[in-house]
Amino acid sequence: MEKLDKTASILSDIQMQLEELNTWKNGLVHTFNSLSKQIDDIKWHLEIDDIAEWKKIRFTGPPPSEYSYNIIKDMGGPFSAKPEPQDHVIIYAYTFYPKNLDGDKKYPLMVLVHGGIHGDFESSNADVVRNLIQQGYIVIAPEYRGSIGYGAVFYHLIDYGGLEIDDTHTARDWMLENCPQVDLERIGIMGYSHGGLHTLLNIFRYPKDYTAAYAGVPVSDLVSRLSYRWKGSPTDMGRNYGGKSPRDDIDEYRRRSPAWNAHKLEIPLLIHTNTNDRDVPVIEVESLITHLKAAGKEFEYKIYQEIPGGHTFERLDTPIAREARLEAYRFLAKYLKPENPP
């Protein structure tokens, strides 16, 4: 019996040490991500300074969701006992302006949304930003809650398809309030993958606030997506989605899914997808397309056939990628009318 007690004590000590190591490891990951973000911010100068003025700004988004708050409350997060209206989350964003900005002119605004469940706006997006600046856009790229590079608390504030969508919309509002050169009648939004989900949910929830939109390989249907993408437990499944699995709260997953909100489309929209996309399979985007058609909505889409690169095919340095981006730019330019359309 004494031997069993000693073994149990040793196992308990090992378990505690493993938990401490895991906490330490996670802390190192966020420290590394923060350093990587600072290094990448320096790279932006090399990529964009010849044609644009840019600045990283901060604004406030909505308070954390109750589920997110319960995760961060023991992490030393700057919040009171429960989320209150005054406990706004601080959001970062990148702003880009043409170098020769004319203070007496009006310019179209592009809200450019990064992808990734936990991603960030990296300098790898410089080609798209350059293209937009050359056409005559002002650009804002929000680092919505859950983005990496801002520490563990911000990482765990993620609210997939929920408050993060409001963060992106608030970035749009910030630019209107702080840049008088932005034309209120010419506001576009675009993004790839999870950025495509942001694009779609923004125009569905705030249809009067945007003029035209482009969604590339967009996450479109969380209900079907998790049925074939997720291999963890229902508890793990809900970690990024408000704490519940689809079978616990199917209506909430539909609320956060573009396909189930397609009837709200009111502005011009272009969608691209690729038949060999393994991240957002074409069947998921086809669900969105089917819902839009069933609702009698006018929109444009293109299903690319087996293009190398799969999910990232439009963001590569290949002729077909440049062609796809050009198609998106031309579509948006019809409605946003930049000074130098492609």
Regions found by a protein language model. Give the residues of each.
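N-terminal targeting or regulatory segments adjacent to alpha/beta-hydrolase or S9 domains
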Residues: M1-P63, P342
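Intrinsically disordered, low-complexity regions enriched for glutamine and histidine
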Residues: D13-Q15, L112, L270, G309
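Short beta-alpha junctions and helix-cap segments that line functional grooves
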Residues: K43, S124-V128, T199-L200, L316
